[in-house]
A protein has these predicted regions:
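Catalytic cores of enzymes that engage adenine nucleotides and/or redox cofactors via long glycine-rich
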Residues: 158-163, 181
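Active-site-proximal substrate-binding core of FAD-dependent oxidoreductases
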Residues: 165-169, 202-227
Length: 227
């Protein structure tokens, strides 16, 4: 992968630990197909209220403290396709800091899938109060045309998200297990959550028969210290 600034560019060879990307659509499809084979699982949508009195809940909705200074990783991305070969599919540009920072942390991310198709994201590390940071479409358009030099392209799809870079509020309800970002599975230094979710899921499965009595799953103290 590569890291760029306004004055320098570095390529880091990590052959033993290759960067990997998972197609979320294919991932959800595989999991949903597996879940559908279990007759004791039902899916409900558009439920506004649930009765917690006789239920055990796995909750993925973070309880976010009302703190305007909380740090978020918020991003918008587009998958673009060009008529001519443009990208080096062997190198992901993990962070390009050659862009307006506006006293926060701002970078662009480029993940090539092949020579003429790539995902490009604008990413900010900031609070969510400054609306001037959120003209994402214009940021992407300017970066693609002016920094990458791509004048003609089509957009296959768009994505967006906001990842809390702080630990959510935890309740002591022994009828609820918080999972995902709500369960503190996000690495605060990177925003990465996926692998920690897999480890938490294994922990839940291993202890499912005594789920109400097990200790809360935490990231290793080493990673909490580093974050």
């Amino acid at each position: 992968f590569s890291i760029k600034t306004s004055s320098d560019s570095k390529i880091i060879n990590c052959g033993n630990f290759p960067y990997q990307s998972i197609d979320s659509g294919l991932f959800y499809k595989k999991i949903n197909e597996r879940l559908a084979k279990n007759k004791n699982i039902e899916f409900f949508e558009n439920i506004k209220e649930i009765d917690k009195s006789n239920s055990f809940i796995f909750n993925s909705v973070p309880s976010v403290p009302n703190n305007k200074s909380n740090l978020w990783q918020h991003f918008h991305g587009v998958e673009i396709e060009t008529k001519e070969n443009f990208f080096n599919e062997k190198i992901v540009n993990l962070m390009d800091f050659n862009c307006d920072q506006k006293n926060d942390v701002h970078f662009f991310y480029t993940l090539p899938f092949n020579k003429n198709r790539a995902l490009i994201e604008t990413t900010w590390l900031s609070d969510l109060e400054d609306q001037s940071l959120m003209n994402y479409d214009l940021q992407l358009e300017n970066y693609i045309k002016n920094n990458l030099g791509i004048k003609s392209y089509s957009i296959n799809f768009k994505e967006k998200g906001a990842i809390p870079l702080f630990y959510p509020s935890f309740n002591n309800d022994n009828k609820t297990i918080n999972i995902g970002a709500a369960g503190g599975m996000t690495r605060l230094s990177t925003g990465y959550t996926f692998l920690n979710i897999q480890e938490h899921s294994k922990y839940i499965v291993k202890n499912i028969n005594r789920i109400e009595k097990i200790r809360m799953f935490h990231l290793g103290k080493k990673y909490q210290f580093l974050d």
